[in-house]
Amino acid sequence: MSEFIKPNWKKSNLNISATLAEFLGAPNKNNTLALLKEELAKEYKNVIFICFDGMGINPLETNLSEDSFLIKHIKQTLTSTFPSTTTNATTSLACNKQPLEHGWFGWSMHFEEIKRNLDIYIHKDSQTKEIVNYEYPLADNSN
């Protein structure tokens, strides 16, 4: 059985968003990544951010040799949000918010206002697969 990896909120995928937000002059209240800040300080003409969903360190180390391109070019290992679902992690990346702030924890969620379970990324009813045009709210944690 593999070891449970706990999120490190100072070195996680959320901190990529925080660093990019700071770089672009957007509001940010999360920790940034020193290594990424150093790279961005080089004043590149263009910066491209690519997210490989599910590409964690364990599958890389298990399936690739030490001399593989990806292994040789690892700069830093980060953890993911928790839970590390596609919806949760990519929403944190996209909006620079902790999971409790955005509230998108899983692929399918129940929305009481419309009495439906929706697959939020593909905008479909979880049971009928009907496309649903619904403005998904982010969590309101102002209380």
Task: Enumerate the predicted regions with their spans.
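Active-site nucleophile/metal-coordination loop of metallo-enzymes that catalyze phosphate/sulfate
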Residues: M1-V47, G54-N141
